[in-house]
Amino acid sequence: MSDYKSTLNLPETEFPMRGNLANREPEMLKSWNENGLYQQIRESRKDAKPFILHDGPPYANGDIHIGHSVNKILKDIIIKSKTMSGFDAPYIPGWDCHGLPIELKVEQKVGKPGHKVTAAEFRQKCREYAAKQVDGQREDFIRLGVFADWQNPYLTMDFSTEANIVRSLSKVIENGHLHKGVKPVHWCTDCGSALAEAEVEYEDKMSPAIDVAFTAVDKSALLAKFGLADYAHNISMVIWTTTPWTLPANRALAVAANVEYTLVEMVKDGQTQALVLATDLYESCIERFGAESHTVLGTVAGSDLELLRFNHPFYDFDVPVILGDHVTVDSGTGVVHTAPGHGQDDFVVGQKYGLEVANPVGDNGVYKPDTEIFAGLHVFKANKNVVELLEEKGALLSHVQIKHSYPHCWRHKTPIIFRATPQWFISMDQKGLRTQAISEIEQTKWIPDWGQSRIEKMVENRPDWCISRQRTWGVPITLFVHRETEELHPDSVSLMERVAARIEQQGIQAWWDLDASELLGDEADQYRKVTDTLDVWYDSGSTFSTVVAARPEFHGHDIDLYLEGSDQHRGWFMSSLMISTAMNGKAPYKQVLTHGFTVDGQGRKMSKSVGNVISPQHVTNKLGADILRLWVAATDYSGEMTVSDQILNRSADAYRRIRNTARFLLANINGFDPVSDMVAIEDMVALDRWVVRRAAALQQELLEAYDEYNFHLVTQKLMQFCSVELGSFYLDIIKDRQYTAKGDSNARRSCQSALYLISEAMVRWIAPILSFTADEIWKLLPGERGEYVFTETWYEGLKSITLESDLSDEYWDQLLAVRAEVNKVIENARREKQIGGSLEAEVTLFADDALSAVLEKLGDELRFVLLTSKTEVVALAAAPSDAIGTELASLKLSLKKSEAEKCERCWHHREDVGTVTEHPTLCVRCVTNIEGDGEVRQFA
C-alpha cells in the first residue's frame, strides 16, 4: 500500500481534535485585547444601522455567579449576531456602585461614618471598594469571551453619571411627579434613627398577644352580606395583634379577598354576641375566647366585606374593611389590624385605599403630646395601658403573653418599632404616571409575552415609589426646602443644574461640601439642604438617560433591548419604565427579554449550604468558556435553566461533535484555493449541490432563530445538521471521492467547493456562541480574509440552486431513509462477524416500482451512497422469503459478503481488481484516478 499512499488525498489540518479550551482561550483573549478587537468591530460598522442593547448593571460586590454568566453570555450572543447581521451594536457594560451592601462592607473595615472616619472619608472608602469589586468582576466577564468596551464601562459612581442622575431627578420634578409623604421604616428609639434592613436582628421577645373586637357601625348592612335580616346582639370583627401600642394608629381592618369568613354567635359569661372570623380559624378562636357555646350564622367571601365600617375600640371614629394580599389564615383571626404608620404591608395596602398614615409616636418612642389618652407614654410601657383600656371598654376577647421572634437594633440589642417618617416619593397618580406607564407597556414587545401582564399588574397595584434613603453612600437628593413651610425652593430645577455641574467635577461629595449660601445667597437662612440619598434603583433605573443618552457611542439612538432575569419586572424594568415615563412620557425600551433563574439538576436553587453551587470560574477553568456558552445557548431560557456537572459534560459532548465536524471540513479543504479551484454550483456533483442547498436553507432558519433570540433552536438545528445531514450522511459518503479521486478532478473539487462553502457559513453561524472556536477555525480557512470573523457578516456564498435535471430534496430524503435501513443491516452483519466493514458487503435492494425508479437513477453510483462495494436493485416481488424486512414497506434487503478481491487503494471489493497488469492490486477506477483523467461522478 505504501506505493499508493502518496496518490491519495489524505486529510490534513493544524486544527487539533481536542479543544483544550481552558488553556487555549486565555491566549486568544490576550491576542484579542492586544489587537483592539472590540474597536476593530466598531470601526467595521461605522455608519451601519444601530442596534442598542443596554446593559442592566450588576451590583459591584462579590464574585460573579452562574446567573451573571447566563445574563452576560445571552447579551453577548445577541450583540455578536446583530453585528453579523450588519448592525452597529456597541456594548457598554455597567455596574451599580452605590448603596447599603457596599456601606456594610466598608463599615466592617473602618467603622461607621462619623465615628473613626468622617462621612466624606467614608464615601471615598466606598468608592475605592466598589472600584476594586468592578475590577474583579470585569476580569471574570472578559474570561467568558464577552466582547465589550471593558476599559470604558459605565459606573453609577462616575462623576458624570452621578451628575446626570441629579439632572434626571430635576426633570422628574419639573414634570410634577415628586411629592413628599411619609413611609414606615425600622426605627430604633435608642438610636433615634431609621435602620436599614441589614441593621435589624431578630431575637426572641415576650409580648402581649390580644384579640380585640371592633363593633359594626351598620349592623343591617353587615347582616345582609351574610343573608340575614336581623340580629338582636352586638356584631364585631375581631383582630389579633402582638403590638397593642399600635392600636391608636389603627385606620382599617384587612381581610383576604378569596378567604371565607364565618359569622359565629358566641355565648360567654351569659353575654351573647356575634363575631366575624376566618372560617379556617373560628373554632380555635372561640376556644381561645373561652366561649361556653357557639352557633354558625352564615359565611361569606372576604371580598364581600370590603368597605363595611367598624368602630375603633377606644377612639371616637370608625374604620373600613379593606382587602390585602398579605392577610393569611395561618394564625390569629384572619383579620389584620391595619396601622399604615406602623407596618410596611399596612402602609402599602393603605396607599391603595388612601388611608391616613397616622404616626402618633415621636423619635424617642414616646407618644406625641397630641395623642389622645396615651400622650407622654413610651410605646412598650403603654402596652399595659392599652390592654387595660380595651378591657374597660369590653373590647378585649383574650390576652396572653407569648414568646416570638421580634426585630431588634443590632447596636443596642433592644426591640425596635416600625414608624412612619417623612420621605420623598415619585407619585403614580398626581400627574397620571400610572396610566401613561401602562400604555407604554402595551407599546413594548415582551419576550416571553407573559412578561407584559406581569409588569402590567405590578404597575396597576404598586404604591407611590419612595425614592429617598437615609444613607451615606448614595446620590444625594439635591433639594433645598423651606425651613418653615417645607416647600421646595421655587428655583429647584435651575439650582439642581448648578449642583450637577459641581458634581460633574467633584462627585457627590460636592453636595455635602456645599454651603447653601453659595447658591442661595441671602435666602440661605430660610432653607435647609435635604440630607437624604436616592434609592439605588433610581441610579440604575435612570441609566437610559444618564448613560445611553449621554455617551457618544450610542449616537442618541433609542434603546432596542433590555435583557435581564425575570425578577427584574419588579426591579430594573420597573424603575426604568417609571423614570423614563416620568421624564420623557415614554418607555426607555422597545423590547424586553427575560431569562429564568439557574437551578441545579434537581431543580433546586443554588446554595452554598446545599453544596450545589456551580461557579462560572470552575467551569471555565475545567471545561472552557465555549462549553459554558454552548450550555447557555442550548438551554431554553424562558423557564428555569438547569445546570449541573453532568449537564455541562453533555454540553462538552455536543461541543466535541461540532468541533469534529469543523476538523473534518478543515482537513479536507487543506490546500484548496477558493479562487482557482472553486467549482460553480451548477457544475457540482448532485450530492454536493444538495448539501449546499441544505446549508443555504439552514442558514435562513438559523438567521431567523438568531433574530428572534431563539438560541436553543440555533444549537438544535446546528447539531442536527452536523450529526445527521453531514455526519451520518454527506461526510460519510464523500470520504471515498475526496480521498481517492484525482486531486484536481471535478469529482474532488466539487466536493471541496461544497465543504469550503459550508465552512465559510458555519464559522459565522457558530461565532456568536462558540466565539473562541470560531476564531480558531477562521484562522485556518483557506483564501484571503479579514483578521477576525467577528467583523464579517453572514456568508453570502451559499446559493440554493436546483437544476431542471436535478434530484430534488425529497429525492435525497428518500435516499437518507434507505441508507438508514441498509446501515442497520450492515451493522447487524458486523456484530455477527459476517463481514468486517461495510465495503465487504454486497447488498441487494428489493424495491417496489416507485422506489426502484428512485434508486436506479444513480446507476453504479448508488454503491457510493450506501458505502458498499456492490449494490443491485431488484423488484420487490422477487424478494426471497429470507429477505430482511425494513421499516419502509417498499423495501426489503439481502446482504452477502463479497467474494471479489479488495482494491489495495480504495478498499472496495471489485471484480476488476488486477485487470490492469501494471497495477495488479488496484481496481480500474483507481487506475483511472492515478494515471488517467480521473473518474467522472454525476450524482455522488
Curated annotation (Swiss-Prot):
<keyword id="KW-0862">Zinc</keyword>
<keyword id="KW-0436">Ligase</keyword>
<keyword id="KW-0963">Cytoplasm</keyword>
<feature type="binding site">
    <location>
        <position position="608"/>
    </location>
    <ligand>
        <name>ATP</name>
    </ligand>
</feature>
<dbReference type="Pfam" id="PF00133">
    <property type="entry name" value="tRNA-synt_1"/>
</dbReference>
<dbReference type="InterPro" id="IPR014729">
    <property type="entry name" value="Rossmann-like_a/b/a_fold"/>
</dbReference>
<dbReference type="InterPro" id="IPR023585">
    <property type="entry name" value="Ile-tRNA-ligase_type1"/>
</dbReference>
<dbReference type="InterPro" id="IPR050081">
    <property type="entry name" value="Ile-tRNA_ligase"/>
</dbReference>
<dbReference type="GO" id="GO:0006428">
    <property type="term" value="P:isoleucyl-tRNA aminoacylation"/>
</dbReference>
<comment type="function">
    <text>Catalyzes the attachment of isoleucine to tRNA(Ile). As IleRS can inadvertently accommodate and process structurally similar amino acids such as valine, to avoid such errors it has two additional distinct tRNA(Ile)-dependent editing activities. One activity is designated as 'pretransfer' editing and involves the hydrolysis of activated Val-AMP. The other activity is designated 'posttransfer' editing and involves deacylation of mischarged Val-tRNA(Ile).</text>
</comment>
<feature type="binding site">
    <location>
        <position position="564"/>
    </location>
    <ligand>
        <name>L-isoleucyl-5'-AMP</name>
    </ligand>
</feature>
<dbReference type="InterPro" id="IPR010663">
    <property type="entry name" value="Znf_FPG/IleRS"/>
</dbReference>
<keyword id="KW-0067">ATP-binding</keyword>
<dbReference type="InterPro" id="IPR001412">
    <property type="entry name" value="aa-tRNA-synth_I_CS"/>
</dbReference>
<feature type="binding site">
    <location>
        <position position="923"/>
    </location>
    <ligand>
        <name>Zn(2+)</name>
    </ligand>
</feature>
<comment type="similarity">
    <text>Belongs to the class-I aminoacyl-tRNA synthetase family. IleS type 1 subfamily.</text>
</comment>
<dbReference type="InterPro" id="IPR002300">
    <property type="entry name" value="aa-tRNA-synth_Ia"/>
</dbReference>
<comment type="subunit">
    <text>Monomer.</text>
</comment>
<feature type="short sequence motif" description="'HIGH' region">
    <location>
        <begin position="58"/>
        <end position="68"/>
    </location>
</feature>
<dbReference type="GO" id="GO:0008270">
    <property type="term" value="F:zinc ion binding"/>
</dbReference>
<dbReference type="Pfam" id="PF06827">
    <property type="entry name" value="zf-FPG_IleRS"/>
</dbReference>
<keyword id="KW-0030">Aminoacyl-tRNA synthetase</keyword>
<keyword id="KW-0547">Nucleotide-binding</keyword>
<keyword id="KW-0479">Metal-binding</keyword>
<dbReference type="GO" id="GO:0005524">
    <property type="term" value="F:ATP binding"/>
</dbReference>
<feature type="short sequence motif" description="'KMSKS' region">
    <location>
        <begin position="605"/>
        <end position="609"/>
    </location>
</feature>
<dbReference type="InterPro" id="IPR002301">
    <property type="entry name" value="Ile-tRNA-ligase"/>
</dbReference>
<protein>
    <recommendedName>
        <fullName>Isoleucine--tRNA ligase</fullName>
        <ecNumber>6.1.1.5</ecNumber>
    </recommendedName>
</protein>
<dbReference type="GO" id="GO:0005829">
    <property type="term" value="C:cytosol"/>
</dbReference>
<dbReference type="InterPro" id="IPR009080">
    <property type="entry name" value="tRNAsynth_Ia_anticodon-bd"/>
</dbReference>
<feature type="binding site">
    <location>
        <position position="906"/>
    </location>
    <ligand>
        <name>Zn(2+)</name>
    </ligand>
</feature>
<dbReference type="GO" id="GO:0002161">
    <property type="term" value="F:aminoacyl-tRNA deacylase activity"/>
</dbReference>
<feature type="binding site">
    <location>
        <position position="903"/>
    </location>
    <ligand>
        <name>Zn(2+)</name>
    </ligand>
</feature>
<dbReference type="InterPro" id="IPR013155">
    <property type="entry name" value="M/V/L/I-tRNA-synth_anticd-bd"/>
</dbReference>
<dbReference type="InterPro" id="IPR033708">
    <property type="entry name" value="Anticodon_Ile_BEm"/>
</dbReference>
<dbReference type="GO" id="GO:0004822">
    <property type="term" value="F:isoleucine-tRNA ligase activity"/>
</dbReference>
<keyword id="KW-0648">Protein biosynthesis</keyword>
<dbReference type="Pfam" id="PF08264">
    <property type="entry name" value="Anticodon_1"/>
</dbReference>
<dbReference type="InterPro" id="IPR009008">
    <property type="entry name" value="Val/Leu/Ile-tRNA-synth_edit"/>
</dbReference>
<feature type="binding site">
    <location>
        <position position="926"/>
    </location>
    <ligand>
        <name>Zn(2+)</name>
    </ligand>
</feature>
<dbReference type="GO" id="GO:0000049">
    <property type="term" value="F:tRNA binding"/>
</dbReference>
